[in-house]
Amino acid sequence: MTSATSPILLKWDPKSLEIRTLTVERLLEPLVTQVTTLVNTSNKGPSSKKKGRSKKAHVLAVSVEQATQNFLEKGEQIAKDSQDLKEELIAAVEDVRKQGDTMRVASSEFADDPCSSVKRGTMVRAARALLSAVTRLLILADMADVMRLLAHLKIELKDPQCRDEMAAARGALKKNATMLYTASQAFLRHPDVAATRANRDYVFKQVQEAIGGISSSAQATSPTDEKHGHAGIGELAAALNEFDNKIILDPLTFSEARFRPSLEERLESIISGAALMADSSCTRDDRRERIVAECNAVRQALQDLLSEYMNNTGRKEKGDPLNSAIDKMTKKTRDLRRQLRKAVMDHISDSFLETNVPLLVLIEAAKSGNEKEVKEYAQVFREHANKLVEVANLACSISNNEEGVKLVRMAATQIDSLCPQVINAALTLAARPQSKVAQDNMDVFKDQWEKQVRILTEAVDDITSVDDFLSVSENHILEDVNKCVIALQEGDVDTLDRTAGAIRGRAARVVHIINAEMENYEPGVYTERVLESIKLLSETVMPRFAEQVEVAIEALSTSPPQPFEENEFIDASRLVYDGVRDIRKAVLMIRTPEELEDDSDFEQEDYDARSRTSIQTEDDQLIAGQSARAIMAQLPQEEKAKIAEQVESFRQEKSKLDAEVAKWDDNGNDIIVLAKQMCMIMMEMTDFTRGKGPLKNSSDVINAAKKIAEAGSRMDKLARAVADQCPDSACKQDLLAYLQRIALYCHQLNICSKVKAEVQNLGGELIVSGLDSATSLIQAAKNLMNAVVLTVKASYVASTKYQKVYGTAAVNSPVVSWRMKAPEKKPLVKREKPEECQTRVRRGSQKKHISPVQALSEFKAMDSF
């Protein structure tokens, strides 16, 4: 296929906008002949060719009109059938229609007065515009045909990596279709401007690489390093994961000379990476100090761990001090991870704020024709782009989300290559500020840049947690509020305006991201609470803050400065911080104590990407920004109904488990705790099949299944300990049988967790199906839930058996403690509301005076009965 592709590439000459297929060339030839015949005159002198009889001008004009109408009809049909380039084709058809009408009027006027040079010039310009519009329509139609063929070829590919490459190549062709036209047109119109050639060559190279990628993926000949150039989790995250695995050693085979240098070398490599992040310009001083402190703590924990290994050398079992040292080591590496994530989020929060400002400033300078300013702002724009790429790579370095890291790196590569071309488009516009072609070229590159920045932002958001984002945003807004107050007191209008704009941008980003996050959950008390906090911030707090900023700037800008209420501004600023803090508190409401660490951060190791948006590369619609969960939500109604039936059956089983665990106090009873955890995770997995819940991608579901398997293993260990102490053989056998069911159903759930909606393109229509995989997942979860219920009951029965036999000695040291859950406490006396106590006045009853003798006599009388 490669040999067949090369001649096509060589025949495609962007200078003349020559199309790439003979079929389209034959379609264009009649119109070119008719138009050129109409506009040609004898100005070039007498011809040596044999004279003949030319058609009348009116006849040629009608022929041009008919040919144009034919293109319009075909173009409208192609636009109607196209899925990928519908909007571009519709715009191209309308352009041909407009230029055709202009040509019809101009040719008619010229035919009536063929001696008029003015009318002839008007017609020549109209003819050129018509040919340009028709050529663009044919290029787009050709591209649509190529993409349609590629879609069918992509379905036939078996290797997922090849399908991904094919999808990426299709996306590149679609992206570069319009850019190819505008860049080539700008180069043709302004060949003396060097930047136009750079733009044209860049787009042409992108198309060449896309076609080469199609050839490679179709033949599965992509080089290994090219296939996996962006694959793998972050380097720092991988090093930390490997270090955590390496610290688990067997004391029996431990050798200090062998293991100490290796572990210390690995740790120093990790600390070097952490130090680079700490020394970065966007890292706050307090964050830098925390990272340094955590690095020192990890060093010390490693030395303590190695000392314990030396003390336990030659032993078969690990002692409690050694286990404690391992736990401490793991905790310290986890703390270091948290600080590194926070440092990365510092960078993201600062760099991905108002990402379009450098571009807009560059374009405004280009429109004014000031090439010197354009070069100055181009440097600022280049630094901004480099910062985005740098921060994106930092985010990748600490992420465990392999799929997300791949997408971020691909998006960052696109940003890096597109940046110089945006500058070239601006230089072209600065050199020819009155040129509509240069302006159109700038607009296309501007749109492409903004789209790529959005993709990069969403991809970076996808590998960071919402909780880290909220924590850092809260701190940054507090910093900016303090800066605003200081600038206000010092009368620094520029700093006040700039910092207030940053506060508005941060608050708007919080609102946008948390609104998107709440779409992952079913409506309920939790989502209502969060959405109320968001509404309060966006509709009440921020308008008041903006109003106070405007008043303050207006008062300080006058000469002399006018007095104003400083306290009003401070109160409005404080409310912004309080509003973001309230949103964070509302989001953290459903976190478990294990998830809420020292600074209320959600420690997310397996779920490193439970967040806003997801961009997949498995299907074209996923590239457009839809997650696997969103695709599940697009299943046909018949499949949704069947899934709903399965979910209802699962809920009935869940209610049984809820009723069982609700009876017991989970303090000292890890079996109940594990049952609750497994129930919660299984509920999230079933929600995924309906396009709901926090799980977004197949990797999230797989990680959830792993968590359930881990919980099942821990429950198996506890329940077997209960069974070992049970003297009743029947109860013991029942409990062990239920444990075998848990192991089986955990394995089934792990297999079914690969649930994924299948998307097929049949006849240009996307067909989404996923009933079998979804129902299998729900059924496996239902079976596991039933096994957990039976295990909890059997564990309690077995515990009662061995307590009866062994007496109080067993009761005092059980494997788990079975205590009935205490009822909720209720006040014995109804408490009055404070406002009622203040307003209600009651008349006290008259106090009765009873003599002691009378009371004693009554007491004796009652005693006599």
UniProtKB/Swiss-Prot annotation:
Q: Any keyword Nucleotide-binding? A: no
- This protein's UniProt keywords: Cell adhesion, Cell junction, Cell membrane, Cell projection, Cytoplasm, Cytoskeleton, Developmental protein, Differentiation, Membrane, Nucleus
Q: What's the protein's topology in the membrane?
A: Peripheral membrane protein
The record ties this protein, via InterPro entries, to:
Alpha-catenin/vinculin-like_sf, Alpha_catenin, Vinculin/catenin
First-listed, main subcellular location of the protein, grouped into a coarse class: membrane
**Function noted in UniProt:** May function as a linker between cadherin adhesion receptors and the cytoskeleton to regulate cell-cell adhesion and differentiation in the nervous system.
Protein name (record): Catenin alpha-2
The organism is Danio rerio (Zebrafish)
| Taxonomic lineage of the native organism | Eukaryota, Metazoa, Chordata, Craniata, Vertebrata
